[in-house]
Curated annotation (Swiss-Prot):
Disulfide bonds join 104-332. Binds 1 [4Fe-4S] cluster. The cluster is coordinated with 3 cysteines and an exchangeable S-adenosyl-L-methionine. Keywords: 4Fe-4S, Cytoplasm, Disulfide bond, Iron, Iron-sulfur, Metal-binding, Methyltransferase, rRNA processing, S-adenosyl-L-methionine, Transferase, tRNA processing. GO terms for cellular component: cytoplasm. This is Probable dual-specificity RNA methyltransferase RlmN. Its cofactor is [4Fe-4S] cluster. [4Fe-4S] cluster binds at residues 111, 115, 118. The active site is at residues 91, 332. NCBIfam families: rRNA_mod_RlmN. SUPFAM superfamilies: Radical SAM enzymes. The lineage of its organism: Bacteria, Bacillati, Bacillota, Clostridia, Eubacteriales. Residues 97-327 form the Radical SAM core domain. GO terms for molecular function: 4 iron, 4 sulfur cluster binding; metal ion binding; rRNA (adenine(2503)-C2-)-methyltransferase activity; rRNA binding; tRNA (adenine(37)-C2)-methyltransferase activity; tRNA binding. The keyword Metal-binding applies.
């Protein structure tokens, strides 16, 4: 049996025709799933019993089990722990803003990028999520919240461009009129810098915001915290980013996790300012999430403020990310790890 959430409208239309059904039935079924949040074929009232029988024999609607659902008492952030059909566990985070609801989704179970400050990569890669599994995070998030999700950030567990085909299919369905109809300009994809895939994505001329996890201003320093730096230099990443800007007209976001004594000095800020000066970009400064498995500590408020103000002297737009959901382990990978460990399960 196949997860119907892995299908585009054209693919489901083709299946309908191959199985003696009218192609327009595909749109009706997706209306039930994406517009009416009905996740059971039997409840689709304008679908014949015969077709429901065929659907039930060939497909399932892959909505995961909700294992845990936490709400922050500080800012209303929600953390959802989900169980997949194969026993694996993923997580997503819903953040409430004045402009609407945003969800941070995972794209892989674990991650093989090995970034030193990230909890989701500690035990390596388990497997990629399918397009439908990524979609299910948004669907279950909306269902639990009881409100529309208007923004998506691909910043949860996993490297999205390491799961390129499934992520591109997810973006197609989530953006489509028949899907969740979320505009590409309301979607941000974060990558540690897989240069060929950045260029491939640029050639699609999508309007998705590209966010680069930079975190250091020299290749030498970046190699100590991000193994991907051994493969792609900062210069190569910036060239790919400029190509993305040229093809899409979209501003790039650079994410920079501030780690005390590692990359947070005034000289680091000056180097970053010189590196990005004149580029169509924005820098998102992130106080690092402290985890037990490493000794990284957050920069002081004073050092963060100095870093921010120094960047601005170079004409580089920058802000400090507001920490959300800290009381519920909202950073990517943290809740999954703590849950699995508490149950004595294997990561």
């Amino acid at each position: 049996m196949k997860n119907i959430l892995d299908f585009t409208l054209e693919e489901l239309k083709e299946w309908m025709k191959e199985n003696g059904e009218n192609a327009f039935r595909a749109k009706q079924i997706f209306d039930w799933i994406y517009k009416k949040e009905v996740f059971n074929f039997e409840e689709m009232k304008n679908i014949s019993k015969a077709l429901i029988g065929k659907l039930s024999e060939n497909f399932y609607i892959g909505i995961p089990e909700v294992i845990d659902y936490l709400s922050s008492s500080e800012d209303g952030t929600r953390k959802i722990l989900l169980g997949l059909g194969d026993g694996n566990i993923i997580e997503c985070v819903i953040m409430k803003y004045k402009y609407g609801n945003s969800i941070c989704v995972s794209t892989q179970i674990g991650c093989r990028m090995g970034c030193k400050f990230c909890a989701s990569t500690l035990e390596g890669m388990v497997r990629n999520l399918t397009a439908g599994e990524i979609l299910s995070e948004v669907l279950i998030g909306q269902k639990l919240l009881g409100e529309r999700i208007s923004n998506i950030v691909l910043m949860g567990s996993g490297e999205p461009l390491d799961n390129y085909d499934n992520v591109m299919k997810f973006l197609e369905i989530v953006n489509a009129d028949y899907g969740l109809n979320i505009g590409q300009r309301h979607i941000t994809l974060s990558t540690c810098g897989l240069v060929p895939k950045i260029r491939e994505m640029a050639d699609k001329e999508m309007q998705v915001t590209l966010a680069i996890s930079l975190h250091a201003v020299s290749d030498e320093k970046r190699k100590t915290i991000m193994p991907i730096a051994n493969k792609y230099s900062i210069s190569e990443i910036l060239d790919a980013c400029n190509y993305y800007i040229e093809k899409t007209g979209r501003r790039i976001t650079f994410e920079y996790s501030l780690v005390s004594g590692v990359n947070d000095t005034k000289e680091d800020a000056k180097s970053l300012g010189r590196l990005l000066k004149g580029m169509l970009c924005h820098v998102n400064l992130i106080p690092v999430n402290e985890i037990k498995e490493n000794e990284f500590k957050k920069s002081t408020k004073k050092d963060i403020e100095t870093f921010l103000n120094t960047l601005k002297t170079y004409g580089v737009e920058a802000t400090v990310r507001r920490e959300m959901g800290s009381d519920i382990n909202a950073a990517c990978g943290q809740l999954r790890r703590s849950y699995i460990k508490s149950k004595g399960l294997k990561l």
